[in-house]
């Protein structure tokens, strides 16, 4: 299994330094999580037939590890009214104090599915089904954003007092996916 989340935040503002001059600031934050499941899977498929109808039930269970890779990047560009441009590390919520990390955690996943099909004639079948997957341990991108920011970091500054914020703490949650499928099969 693999699940990827991405979020980008861009901010642009202008500050007046007098009657006609403006300084422009542009900040960009990028947040990305990539979850990959590695493990063993056990499952069973059972299929029943009755006349032209058939019903298939699928059940799977997997134990293993989820590797959660989190990348947080930010940059600020300042342009003065004289046209001088400077670039600094860190945007607004993405600062040098929270670059993200990679961690592997114990996880389990399960899948359930049911499919019914009907034989219109011996070579042609129609099917419809439902599937559900649950994954116990994933990192979602919005859970990794720390809204607390020490403003000393803005514009490339360093923290001389106060907390090292934003900080990175990996938060995980469960993930549920559902789907409906339809099929058309012709055998020749």
Range-by-range predicted roles:
Residues 126-132:
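Internal, hydrophobic beta-strand segments that form the core of beta-sheet-rich folds
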Residues 40-46, 59-61, 112-118, 128, ...:
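Residues on the lipid-exposed face of transmembrane beta-strands in outer-membrane beta-barrel proteins
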Residues 173-188:
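Outer-membrane beta-barrel "beta-signal"
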Residues 51-57, 106, 122-124, 178-180:
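Outer-envelope beta-barrel architecture signal
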Residues 3-36, 66-107, 139-149, 153, ...:
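Extracellular/periplasm-exposed beta-strand and loop segments of Gram-negative cell-envelope proteins
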